[in-house]
């Protein structure tokens, strides 16, 4: 068994006002964009998934350049971006530009909104039922 991880403050700042458990938001980001840094797995903000392959960049600028190239080469629906690996084709409207998806706070905000939308879709026919956030997270890329 592992001890529960206390999510970093940014996750709480974004998730809690929206009603998303910060642990769920952090778990989604960790699942979607983790890298090994100083012996610990952490979510990495400058992560792209292009046509099913993950790429990690040292800077936001490098990730932005690669993101724009990937969209041009593969199409926006084949590109996921940032901490929550938000799909640019389906969710690009959540950002003012594709590269804005690499802003950690804006990406986590979009990720939280997607989780809320999935929660609402899952529980539309059963209002008042206790929310199973693991089930909601499992619907994240729908």
Regions found by a protein language model. Name each.
Residues 3-142:
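Catalytic glycan-binding domains that act on GlcNAc-containing polysaccharides
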């Amino acid at each position: 068994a592992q001890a529960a991880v206390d999510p970093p403050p940014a996750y709480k700042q974004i998730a809690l006002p929206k009603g998303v458990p910060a642990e769920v938001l952090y778990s989604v980001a960790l699942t979607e964009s983790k890298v090994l840094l100083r012996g610990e797995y952490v979510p990495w903000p400058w992560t792209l998934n292009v046509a099913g392959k993950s790429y990690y960049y040292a800077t936001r600028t490098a990730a932005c350049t690669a993101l724009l190239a990937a969209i041009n080469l593969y199409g926006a629906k084949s590109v996921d971006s940032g901490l929550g690996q938000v799909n640019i084709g389906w969710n690009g409207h959540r950002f003012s530009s594709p590269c804005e998806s690499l802003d950690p706070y804006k990406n986590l905000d979009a990720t939280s909104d997607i989780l809320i939308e999935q929660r609402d879709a899952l529980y539309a026919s059963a209002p008042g039922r206790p929310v199973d956030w693991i089930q909601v997270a499992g619907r994240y890329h729908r």
